[in-house]
Amino acid sequence: MLELKEKIGTLEKNDVKIATIMALLMGTFFIYIGKLPLAVTFIPGLVISLALIYFMYAKQLELPSAKSFVPLFFASFAWQFIHFNEEFVTGFYREFPLLFGSHPYSVERFVTINMISYCVFSLGCIIVFTQKLKFLVLPMLFYIVYGMIGNAITHTWWSLLHWGYFPGFYTAQGYWVLGFIVLSRFLKSRKATVLTFIGFALIVLPLITLTEWYHD
């Protein structure tokens, strides 16, 4: 039977090493299955997630207790299904790749990318807090950094940039709040959370904007 461990402790050197290898594998998968659109969106989110792991290791920050974090994580994760529904019914899988000069994703590819990701995110959280395999904080952090914070920033930016609704915009607004709450609980620092928001915006917004203009 799986039992939540209340005290997870800090990241160790091996956790960081394995997380780095995982980041390379995840990045390769994203580029393979999603091509340029995921290369300019998911990869920066992955790099920032890995940077937070190095930050936590350098500062020897203890991971939050299962009681304080796991229910919050899955409550916020439930919102992702609502967000996915909005993206699906409004044609995000068609509009998103077109921004970068790529062909629209098939329904099968779009659903596969999301369902595999959701499986990894949820299992990662469960395993971290039951088996203490702390290197699996990487997929958890990636969901928080890109799936929450990234969605809030990019969907808002695309709607502003195009002066109109962009698929997924409405439900993405919830992630401004959820992303801040979940990451600040995980890092135990509001300052680090705000800097993550700012850092993501400074890196990703120019990248996606210039890439879109180039292919326009």
List PLM regions with ranges.
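Hydrophobic cores of alpha-helical transmembrane segments in multi-pass inner/ER membrane proteins
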Residues: 45-57, 116-124, 173-185
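Short aromatic-rich membrane-water interface segments that cap or initiate transmembrane helices
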Residues: 100-113
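Membrane-interface helix-boundary motifs at transmembrane edges
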Residues: 36, 58-70, 129-138, 185-196
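Terminal transmembrane helical module of multi-pass membrane proteins
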Residues: 178-216
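N-terminal membrane topogenic signal
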Residues: 2-22, 37-39
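Non-cytosolic membrane-interface motifs at loop->transmembrane helix junctions
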Residues: 40-42, 100-101, 160-174
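Membrane-interface helix caps and helix-loop-helix hairpins in membrane proteins
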Residues: 32-39, 156-166, 214-216
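Transmembrane alpha-helix/helix-exit interface in multi-pass inner-membrane proteins
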Residues: 77-95
